[in-house]
From Swiss-Prot:
Changing residue 54 to I: In strain: isolate ANT5.10. NCBIfam families: NDH_I_M. The chain crosses the membrane at residues 22-42, 60-80, 94-112, 113-133, 147-167, 194-214, 224-244, 257-277, 284-303, 308-330, 342-362, 391-411. It is a multi-pass membrane protein. Pfam families: Oxidored_q5_N, Proton_antipo_M. Core subunit of the mitochondrial membrane respiratory chain NADH dehydrogenase (Complex I) which catalyzes electron transfer from NADH through the respiratory chain, using ubiquinone as an electron acceptor. Essential for the catalytic activity and assembly of complex I. InterPro entries: NADH4_N, NADH_Q_OxRdtase_chainM/4, NADH_UbQ_OxRdtase, ND/Mrp_TM. This is NADH-ubiquinone oxidoreductase chain 4. It comes from the Eukaryota. The gene is MT-ND4. It is an enzyme of class 7 (translocase).
Length: 459
Protein backbone atom coordinates (compact mmCIF):
# COMPACT_ATOMS: atom_id res chain seq x y z
CA UNK A 1 0.00 0.00 0.00
CA UNK A 2 2.65 2.51 1.11
CA UNK A 3 4.96 1.64 -1.76
CA UNK A 4 2.26 3.06 -4.05
CA UNK A 5 0.95 5.95 -1.93
CA UNK A 6 4.35 7.36 -0.85
CA UNK A 7 5.88 7.47 -4.39
CA UNK A 8 2.61 9.06 -5.61
CA UNK A 9 2.84 11.78 -2.94
CA UNK A 10 6.55 12.18 -3.79
CA UNK A 11 5.42 13.29 -7.25
CA UNK A 12 4.60 16.69 -5.66
CA UNK A 13 8.25 17.57 -4.88
CA UNK A 14 9.30 16.04 -8.22
CA UNK A 15 6.88 18.42 -9.94
CA UNK A 16 7.70 21.57 -7.98
CA UNK A 17 11.48 21.11 -7.65
CA UNK A 18 12.20 19.85 -11.17
CA UNK A 19 14.03 22.05 -13.60
CA UNK A 20 11.49 23.70 -15.95
CA UNK A 21 12.92 21.98 -19.01
CA UNK A 22 12.83 18.55 -17.30
CA UNK A 23 9.38 18.71 -15.68
CA UNK A 24 7.55 16.59 -18.29
CA UNK A 25 10.15 13.85 -18.52
CA UNK A 26 10.60 13.63 -14.73
CA UNK A 27 6.90 13.41 -13.88
CA UNK A 28 6.10 11.01 -16.74
CA UNK A 29 8.93 8.59 -15.94
CA UNK A 30 8.25 8.72 -12.17
CA UNK A 31 4.51 8.08 -12.60
CA UNK A 32 5.17 5.27 -15.10
CA UNK A 33 7.50 3.65 -12.57
CA UNK A 34 4.70 3.83 -9.94
CA UNK A 35 2.27 2.13 -12.33
CA UNK A 36 4.77 -0.68 -13.01
CA UNK A 37 5.38 -1.10 -9.27
CA UNK A 38 1.65 -1.53 -8.79
CA UNK A 39 1.49 -4.60 -11.04
CA UNK A 40 1.92 -6.86 -7.98
CA UNK A 41 -1.64 -5.91 -6.99
CA UNK A 42 -3.04 -7.93 -9.88
CA UNK A 43 -1.63 -11.15 -8.45
CA UNK A 44 -4.25 -12.83 -6.24
CA UNK A 45 -3.12 -16.46 -6.00
CA UNK A 46 -5.79 -17.56 -3.51
CA UNK A 47 -8.53 -15.10 -4.59
CA UNK A 48 -8.27 -13.44 -1.18
CA UNK A 49 -7.79 -9.78 -0.39
CA UNK A 50 -4.49 -8.10 0.47
CA UNK A 51 -5.01 -6.34 3.80
CA UNK A 52 -2.52 -3.48 4.01
CA UNK A 53 -3.88 -1.98 7.24
CA UNK A 54 -7.15 -1.59 9.15
CA UNK A 55 -8.32 1.03 6.67
CA UNK A 56 -6.99 -0.14 3.31
CA UNK A 57 -7.15 -3.39 1.36
CA UNK A 58 -7.29 -4.62 -2.22
CA UNK A 59 -9.12 -7.59 -3.68
CA UNK A 60 -9.73 -8.95 -7.22
CA UNK A 61 -12.46 -6.32 -7.75
CA UNK A 62 -10.48 -3.21 -6.79
CA UNK A 63 -7.05 -4.32 -8.10
CA UNK A 64 -7.78 -3.94 -11.86
CA UNK A 65 -9.34 -0.52 -11.22
CA UNK A 66 -6.33 0.51 -9.12
CA UNK A 67 -4.01 -0.59 -11.88
CA UNK A 68 -6.04 1.36 -14.44
CA UNK A 69 -5.85 4.50 -12.25
CA UNK A 70 -2.07 4.24 -11.90
CA UNK A 71 -1.54 3.41 -15.58
CA UNK A 72 -3.48 6.50 -16.62
CA UNK A 73 -1.42 9.19 -14.85
CA UNK A 74 1.67 9.04 -17.13
CA UNK A 75 -0.66 8.95 -20.14
CA UNK A 76 -2.53 12.05 -18.93
CA UNK A 77 0.76 13.90 -18.41
CA UNK A 78 1.94 12.94 -21.91
CA UNK A 79 -1.37 13.99 -23.49
CA UNK A 80 -1.42 17.41 -21.75
CA UNK A 81 1.92 18.72 -23.04
CA UNK A 82 0.58 20.59 -26.07
CA UNK A 83 -2.42 21.95 -24.16
CA UNK A 84 -0.12 23.55 -21.57
CA UNK A 85 2.67 24.61 -23.94
CA UNK A 86 1.90 28.36 -23.72
CA UNK A 87 1.03 28.39 -19.99
CA UNK A 88 3.47 29.84 -17.42
CA UNK A 89 5.47 27.29 -15.42
CA UNK A 90 3.55 27.91 -12.21
CA UNK A 91 0.28 26.95 -13.91
CA UNK A 92 1.82 23.86 -15.48
CA UNK A 93 2.99 22.70 -12.07
CA UNK A 94 -0.41 23.49 -10.51
CA UNK A 95 -2.11 21.43 -13.22
CA UNK A 96 0.21 18.47 -12.61
CA UNK A 97 -0.36 18.82 -8.85
CA UNK A 98 -4.13 18.58 -9.43
CA UNK A 99 -3.66 15.38 -11.45
CA UNK A 100 -1.42 13.88 -8.73
CA UNK A 101 -3.92 14.86 -5.99
CA UNK A 102 -6.71 13.22 -7.97
CA UNK A 103 -4.64 10.07 -8.46
CA UNK A 104 -3.88 9.87 -4.71
CA UNK A 105 -7.57 10.24 -3.79
CA UNK A 106 -8.61 7.64 -6.39
CA UNK A 107 -6.06 5.06 -5.18
CA UNK A 108 -7.25 5.52 -1.59
CA UNK A 109 -10.92 5.35 -2.66
CA UNK A 110 -10.47 1.99 -4.37
CA UNK A 111 -8.54 0.66 -1.36
CA UNK A 112 -10.84 1.94 1.42
CA UNK A 113 -12.14 -0.70 3.85
CA UNK A 114 -14.69 1.39 5.74
CA UNK A 115 -17.68 2.64 3.77
CA UNK A 116 -17.65 6.05 5.51
CA UNK A 117 -13.98 6.48 4.56
CA UNK A 118 -14.89 5.37 1.03
CA UNK A 119 -17.62 8.05 0.94
CA UNK A 120 -15.26 10.83 2.11
CA UNK A 121 -12.63 9.92 -0.49
CA UNK A 122 -15.33 9.42 -3.15
CA UNK A 123 -16.44 13.03 -2.57
CA UNK A 124 -12.85 14.30 -2.33
CA UNK A 125 -12.21 13.26 -5.95
CA UNK A 126 -14.75 15.94 -7.00
CA UNK A 127 -12.53 18.86 -5.96
CA UNK A 128 -9.46 18.31 -8.19
CA UNK A 129 -11.70 17.24 -11.10
CA UNK A 130 -13.80 20.38 -10.76
CA UNK A 131 -10.68 22.60 -10.67
CA UNK A 132 -9.23 20.85 -13.76
CA UNK A 133 -12.48 21.34 -15.72
CA UNK A 134 -13.24 24.93 -14.67
CA UNK A 135 -9.66 26.28 -14.77
CA UNK A 136 -8.13 24.57 -17.79
CA UNK A 137 -11.14 23.92 -20.05
CA UNK A 138 -11.06 25.37 -23.57
CA UNK A 139 -14.32 27.38 -23.77
CA UNK A 140 -16.16 29.68 -21.38
CA UNK A 141 -18.97 27.07 -21.07
CA UNK A 142 -16.57 25.18 -18.78
CA UNK A 143 -18.02 27.05 -15.78
CA UNK A 144 -21.52 25.86 -16.67
CA UNK A 145 -20.19 22.32 -17.12
CA UNK A 146 -18.46 22.52 -13.73
CA UNK A 147 -21.74 23.59 -12.07
CA UNK A 148 -23.62 20.69 -13.67
CA UNK A 149 -20.90 18.24 -12.64
CA UNK A 150 -20.77 19.49 -9.04
CA UNK A 151 -24.50 19.75 -8.38
CA UNK A 152 -25.50 16.46 -10.00
CA UNK A 153 -22.85 14.48 -8.13
CA UNK A 154 -23.28 16.28 -4.79
CA UNK A 155 -27.09 16.07 -4.82
CA UNK A 156 -26.90 12.37 -5.63
CA UNK A 157 -24.33 11.73 -2.89
CA UNK A 158 -26.00 13.40 0.10
CA UNK A 159 -28.67 10.68 0.62
CA UNK A 160 -25.83 8.11 0.57
CA UNK A 161 -24.21 9.77 3.59
CA UNK A 162 -27.49 9.67 5.55
CA UNK A 163 -28.02 6.01 4.56
CA UNK A 164 -24.47 5.04 5.58
CA UNK A 165 -24.85 6.72 8.99
CA UNK A 166 -28.13 4.83 9.49
CA UNK A 167 -26.47 1.53 8.52
CA UNK A 168 -23.55 2.31 10.84
CA UNK A 169 -25.95 2.83 13.76
CA UNK A 170 -27.96 -0.31 13.04
CA UNK A 171 -25.01 -2.63 12.29
CA UNK A 172 -22.25 -1.18 14.44
CA UNK A 173 -19.64 -1.20 11.68
CA UNK A 174 -19.34 -0.65 7.94
CA UNK A 175 -16.09 -2.57 7.44
CA UNK A 176 -16.32 -4.29 4.05
CA UNK A 177 -14.24 -7.28 5.16
CA UNK A 178 -16.39 -8.21 8.16
CA UNK A 179 -19.80 -6.80 7.27
CA UNK A 180 -21.05 -10.15 5.93
CA UNK A 181 -20.47 -11.78 9.32
CA UNK A 182 -23.14 -9.78 11.16
CA UNK A 183 -25.30 -8.80 8.23
CA UNK A 184 -29.00 -9.17 9.01
CA UNK A 185 -31.44 -9.60 6.13
CA UNK A 186 -33.24 -6.31 5.62
CA UNK A 187 -37.04 -6.45 6.11
CA UNK A 188 -39.22 -5.87 3.07
CA UNK A 189 -40.66 -2.42 3.86
CA UNK A 190 -40.90 1.10 2.46
CA UNK A 191 -38.08 2.30 4.72
CA UNK A 192 -35.77 -0.43 3.37
CA UNK A 193 -36.66 0.52 -0.20
CA UNK A 194 -35.87 4.17 0.58
CA UNK A 195 -32.56 3.12 2.15
CA UNK A 196 -31.70 1.16 -1.01
CA UNK A 197 -32.57 4.15 -3.21
CA UNK A 198 -30.46 6.49 -1.08
CA UNK A 199 -27.47 4.13 -1.21
CA UNK A 200 -27.64 3.43 -4.93
CA UNK A 201 -28.52 6.89 -6.26
CA UNK A 202 -25.04 8.41 -5.72
CA UNK A 203 -23.50 5.68 -7.86
CA UNK A 204 -26.28 5.88 -10.47
CA UNK A 205 -25.51 9.59 -10.96
CA UNK A 206 -21.77 8.88 -11.13
CA UNK A 207 -22.08 6.06 -13.69
CA UNK A 208 -24.32 7.80 -15.04
CA UNK A 209 -27.80 6.29 -15.41
CA UNK A 210 -29.80 7.44 -18.45
CA UNK A 211 -31.85 10.43 -17.28
CA UNK A 212 -29.18 11.52 -14.78
CA UNK A 213 -26.50 11.74 -17.47
CA UNK A 214 -26.82 15.41 -18.50
CA UNK A 215 -23.66 16.47 -16.64
CA UNK A 216 -21.45 13.96 -18.46
CA UNK A 217 -21.45 15.27 -22.08
CA UNK A 218 -21.03 18.84 -20.78
CA UNK A 219 -18.14 17.91 -18.49
CA UNK A 220 -16.42 15.82 -21.19
CA UNK A 221 -16.75 18.40 -23.93
CA UNK A 222 -15.47 21.30 -21.83
CA UNK A 223 -12.73 19.48 -19.89
CA UNK A 224 -9.08 19.60 -21.02
CA UNK A 225 -7.66 16.33 -22.35
CA UNK A 226 -6.47 14.99 -18.97
CA UNK A 227 -9.87 15.81 -17.44
CA UNK A 228 -11.69 13.92 -20.20
CA UNK A 229 -9.35 10.93 -19.89
CA UNK A 230 -9.64 10.54 -16.12
CA UNK A 231 -13.39 11.22 -16.18
CA UNK A 232 -14.09 8.55 -18.80
CA UNK A 233 -11.54 6.00 -17.64
CA UNK A 234 -11.71 6.09 -13.85
CA UNK A 235 -14.32 8.43 -12.34
CA UNK A 236 -17.25 6.68 -14.03
CA UNK A 237 -15.87 3.36 -12.75
CA UNK A 238 -16.10 4.66 -9.17
CA UNK A 239 -19.86 4.43 -9.61
CA UNK A 240 -19.71 0.81 -10.77
CA UNK A 241 -17.27 -0.15 -8.03
CA UNK A 242 -19.40 1.49 -5.32
CA UNK A 243 -22.55 -0.12 -6.70
CA UNK A 244 -20.99 -3.59 -6.56
CA UNK A 245 -19.86 -3.05 -2.97
CA UNK A 246 -23.17 -1.61 -1.74
CA UNK A 247 -25.51 -4.09 -3.48
CA UNK A 248 -23.71 -6.95 -1.70
CA UNK A 249 -24.81 -5.40 1.62
CA UNK A 250 -28.41 -4.61 0.57
CA UNK A 251 -28.80 -8.03 -0.97
CA UNK A 252 -32.45 -9.16 -0.99
CA UNK A 253 -33.82 -5.64 -1.63
CA UNK A 254 -31.85 -5.28 -4.89
CA UNK A 255 -33.76 -8.13 -6.50
CA UNK A 256 -37.14 -6.43 -5.98
CA UNK A 257 -36.04 -2.80 -6.48
CA UNK A 258 -33.90 -3.24 -9.58
CA UNK A 259 -36.70 -3.67 -12.16
CA UNK A 260 -37.38 0.00 -13.07
CA UNK A 261 -33.64 0.74 -13.21
CA UNK A 262 -32.96 -2.27 -15.42
CA UNK A 263 -35.68 -1.17 -17.84
CA UNK A 264 -34.39 2.41 -17.80
CA UNK A 265 -30.84 1.21 -18.53
CA UNK A 266 -31.92 -1.03 -21.41
CA UNK A 267 -33.98 1.81 -22.88
CA UNK A 268 -31.31 4.46 -22.24
CA UNK A 269 -28.59 2.28 -23.75
CA UNK A 270 -30.38 2.28 -27.12
CA UNK A 271 -31.36 5.96 -26.83
CA UNK A 272 -27.82 7.19 -26.14
CA UNK A 273 -26.40 4.96 -28.89
CA UNK A 274 -28.96 6.48 -31.29
CA UNK A 275 -27.98 9.99 -30.11
CA UNK A 276 -24.38 9.12 -31.08
CA UNK A 277 -25.50 8.60 -34.69
CA UNK A 278 -26.74 12.22 -34.78
CA UNK A 279 -23.66 13.88 -33.24
CA UNK A 280 -21.43 16.30 -35.11
CA UNK A 281 -19.16 17.06 -32.14
CA UNK A 282 -16.48 14.38 -31.74
CA UNK A 283 -16.02 14.64 -27.95
CA UNK A 284 -19.78 14.69 -27.43
CA UNK A 285 -20.13 11.46 -29.45
CA UNK A 286 -17.51 9.69 -27.32
CA UNK A 287 -19.19 11.00 -24.13
CA UNK A 288 -22.61 9.63 -25.17
CA UNK A 289 -21.02 6.30 -26.10
CA UNK A 290 -19.69 6.19 -22.50
CA UNK A 291 -23.26 6.57 -21.18
CA UNK A 292 -24.35 3.69 -23.42
CA UNK A 293 -21.52 1.39 -22.26
CA UNK A 294 -22.07 2.24 -18.59
CA UNK A 295 -25.78 1.36 -18.94
CA UNK A 296 -24.62 -2.18 -19.81
CA UNK A 297 -22.48 -2.22 -16.66
CA UNK A 298 -25.46 -1.13 -14.50
CA UNK A 299 -27.58 -3.93 -16.03
CA UNK A 300 -24.85 -6.49 -15.23
CA UNK A 301 -24.52 -5.32 -11.60
CA UNK A 302 -28.26 -5.11 -10.86
CA UNK A 303 -29.01 -8.63 -12.13
CA UNK A 304 -26.79 -9.81 -9.22
CA UNK A 305 -25.16 -12.95 -10.61
CA UNK A 306 -21.45 -13.93 -10.51
CA UNK A 307 -21.31 -13.80 -14.32
CA UNK A 308 -22.77 -10.30 -14.22
CA UNK A 309 -20.06 -9.06 -11.85
CA UNK A 310 -17.40 -10.61 -14.09
CA UNK A 311 -18.90 -8.93 -17.16
CA UNK A 312 -19.22 -5.57 -15.40
CA UNK A 313 -15.57 -5.59 -14.24
CA UNK A 314 -14.26 -6.63 -17.68
CA UNK A 315 -16.40 -4.03 -19.45
CA UNK A 316 -15.33 -1.25 -17.05
CA UNK A 317 -11.62 -1.89 -17.64
CA UNK A 318 -12.08 -2.31 -21.40
CA UNK A 319 -14.16 0.84 -21.67
CA UNK A 320 -11.70 2.79 -19.51
CA UNK A 321 -8.82 2.15 -21.89
CA UNK A 322 -10.86 2.44 -25.11
CA UNK A 323 -12.67 5.70 -24.29
CA UNK A 324 -9.46 7.26 -22.97
CA UNK A 325 -7.75 6.38 -26.26
CA UNK A 326 -10.63 7.86 -28.28
CA UNK A 327 -10.41 11.11 -26.28
CA UNK A 328 -6.66 11.26 -26.96
CA UNK A 329 -7.28 10.82 -30.68
CA UNK A 330 -10.03 13.47 -30.63
CA UNK A 331 -7.59 15.78 -28.84
CA UNK A 332 -4.81 15.19 -31.40
CA UNK A 333 -7.35 16.17 -34.10
CA UNK A 334 -8.34 19.27 -32.12
CA UNK A 335 -4.69 20.33 -31.70
CA UNK A 336 -4.28 20.36 -35.49
CA UNK A 337 -7.58 21.73 -36.85
CA UNK A 338 -8.80 23.61 -33.72
CA UNK A 339 -12.33 22.29 -34.06
CA UNK A 340 -14.23 19.36 -32.59
CA UNK A 341 -16.61 19.13 -35.57
CA UNK A 342 -16.08 15.80 -37.30
CA UNK A 343 -16.70 17.03 -40.86
CA UNK A 344 -13.91 19.60 -40.51
CA UNK A 345 -11.39 16.78 -40.03
CA UNK A 346 -12.42 14.60 -42.97
CA UNK A 347 -9.80 13.05 -45.20
CA UNK A 348 -7.04 13.07 -42.57
CA UNK A 349 -6.08 9.49 -43.48
CA UNK A 350 -4.13 10.75 -46.51
CA UNK A 351 -2.09 13.19 -44.39
CA UNK A 352 -1.69 11.16 -41.17
CA UNK A 353 -1.84 7.45 -42.06
CA UNK A 354 -0.45 6.20 -38.72
CA UNK A 355 -3.03 8.21 -36.76
CA UNK A 356 -5.69 6.67 -39.02
CA UNK A 357 -4.43 3.23 -37.92
CA UNK A 358 -4.88 4.22 -34.27
CA UNK A 359 -8.38 5.46 -35.09
CA UNK A 360 -9.19 2.11 -36.70
CA UNK A 361 -7.91 0.12 -33.70
CA UNK A 362 -9.77 2.33 -31.20
CA UNK A 363 -13.03 2.16 -33.17
CA UNK A 364 -12.81 -1.63 -33.53
CA UNK A 365 -12.23 -1.96 -29.78
CA UNK A 366 -15.16 0.37 -29.12
CA UNK A 367 -17.54 -1.75 -31.20
CA UNK A 368 -16.30 -4.91 -29.38
CA UNK A 369 -14.62 -6.75 -32.23
CA UNK A 370 -13.54 -10.30 -31.33
CA UNK A 371 -11.30 -11.21 -29.52
CA UNK A 372 -11.12 -7.92 -27.55
CA UNK A 373 -11.96 -7.79 -23.83
CA UNK A 374 -14.78 -5.41 -24.75
CA UNK A 375 -16.44 -8.38 -26.44
CA UNK A 376 -15.78 -10.67 -23.45
CA UNK A 377 -17.44 -8.10 -21.17
CA UNK A 378 -20.41 -7.58 -23.49
CA UNK A 379 -20.96 -11.32 -23.95
CA UNK A 380 -20.92 -11.92 -20.20
CA UNK A 381 -23.41 -9.07 -19.71
CA UNK A 382 -25.63 -10.47 -22.49
CA UNK A 383 -25.62 -13.96 -20.91
CA UNK A 384 -26.42 -12.44 -17.50
CA UNK A 385 -29.31 -10.33 -18.74
CA UNK A 386 -30.63 -13.28 -20.80
CA UNK A 387 -30.78 -15.35 -17.61
CA UNK A 388 -32.87 -12.54 -16.07
CA UNK A 389 -35.19 -12.04 -19.08
CA UNK A 390 -35.05 -13.47 -22.60
CA UNK A 391 -36.32 -10.27 -24.25
CA UNK A 392 -33.22 -8.31 -23.19
CA UNK A 393 -31.16 -10.14 -25.80
CA UNK A 394 -33.07 -8.24 -28.55
CA UNK A 395 -32.35 -4.88 -26.90
CA UNK A 396 -28.68 -5.63 -26.22
CA UNK A 397 -28.27 -7.04 -29.75
CA UNK A 398 -29.79 -3.84 -31.17
CA UNK A 399 -27.45 -1.78 -28.99
CA UNK A 400 -24.42 -3.73 -30.29
CA UNK A 401 -25.57 -3.05 -33.86
CA UNK A 402 -25.98 0.70 -33.26
CA UNK A 403 -22.60 0.80 -31.43
CA UNK A 404 -20.95 -0.74 -34.50
CA UNK A 405 -22.74 1.79 -36.72
CA UNK A 406 -21.68 4.92 -34.81
CA UNK A 407 -18.11 3.64 -34.28
CA UNK A 408 -17.69 3.13 -38.03
CA UNK A 409 -19.51 6.42 -38.73
CA UNK A 410 -17.01 8.20 -36.47
CA UNK A 411 -14.07 6.48 -38.17
CA UNK A 412 -15.26 7.19 -41.73
CA UNK A 413 -16.29 10.81 -41.04
CA UNK A 414 -12.97 11.77 -39.45
CA UNK A 415 -10.58 9.77 -41.65
CA UNK A 416 -12.11 9.17 -45.09
CA UNK A 417 -13.57 11.53 -47.68
CA UNK A 418 -12.23 14.47 -49.62
CA UNK A 419 -9.66 16.61 -47.85
CA UNK A 420 -10.91 20.10 -46.97
CA UNK A 421 -9.04 22.95 -48.67
CA UNK A 422 -7.49 24.47 -45.52
CA UNK A 423 -5.94 21.23 -44.17
CA UNK A 424 -2.69 21.15 -46.13
CA UNK A 425 0.08 22.27 -43.79
CA UNK A 426 -0.64 20.16 -40.71
CA UNK A 427 1.93 19.01 -38.18
CA UNK A 428 2.87 15.34 -38.65
CA UNK A 429 1.94 12.86 -35.91
CA UNK A 430 4.43 13.12 -33.06
CA UNK A 431 6.33 10.28 -31.37
CA UNK A 432 4.70 11.38 -28.10
CA UNK A 433 1.23 10.82 -29.59
CA UNK A 434 2.12 7.45 -31.09
CA UNK A 435 3.61 6.32 -27.75
CA UNK A 436 0.45 7.51 -26.01
CA UNK A 437 -1.81 5.50 -28.34
CA UNK A 438 0.35 2.37 -28.14
CA UNK A 439 0.27 2.56 -24.31
CA UNK A 440 -3.53 2.48 -24.53
CA UNK A 441 -3.75 -0.34 -27.04
CA UNK A 442 -1.06 -2.64 -25.58
CA UNK A 443 -2.90 -3.35 -22.29
CA UNK A 444 -6.04 -4.09 -24.34
CA UNK A 445 -4.10 -6.59 -26.47
CA UNK A 446 -2.39 -8.23 -23.48
CA UNK A 447 -5.67 -8.53 -21.59
CA UNK A 448 -7.12 -10.28 -24.63
CA UNK A 449 -4.50 -13.01 -24.06
CA UNK A 450 -5.23 -13.32 -20.32
CA UNK A 451 -8.58 -11.75 -19.36
CA UNK A 452 -8.96 -13.61 -16.06
CA UNK A 453 -6.90 -11.03 -14.13
CA UNK A 454 -9.65 -8.43 -14.65
CA UNK A 455 -12.74 -10.63 -14.23
CA UNK A 456 -13.18 -9.70 -10.58
CA UNK A 457 -13.77 -11.69 -7.38
CA UNK A 458 -16.43 -14.02 -8.80
CA UNK A 459 -14.19 -15.64 -11.46
Amino acid sequence: MLKIIIPTIMLFPVTWYSNNSMIWINTTSHSLMISLMGLFLLNHPSNNSNNFSLNFFSDPLSSPLLMLTMWLLPLMIMASQYHLAKEPWFRKKSYLSMLITLQTFLIMTFMATELILFYILFEATLIPTLIIITRWGNQTERLNAGMYFLFYTLTGSLPLLVALIYLQNSMGSLNLLTINLWLKELPNSWSTNLLWMACIMAFMVKMPLYGLHLWLPKAHVEAPIAGSMVLAAVLLKLGGYGMMRITMILDPTTKSMAYPFLMLCLWGMIMTSSICLRQTDLKSLIAYSSVSHMALVIVAILVQTPLGFMGATALMIAHGLTSSMLFCLANSNYERIHSRTMLMARGLQTLLPLTATWWLLASLNNLALPPSINLIGELLVTITSFSWSNITVILIGLNMLITALYSLYMLITTQRGKLTYYLHNLNPSLTRENTLMSMHILPLLFLTLNPKIILGPTF
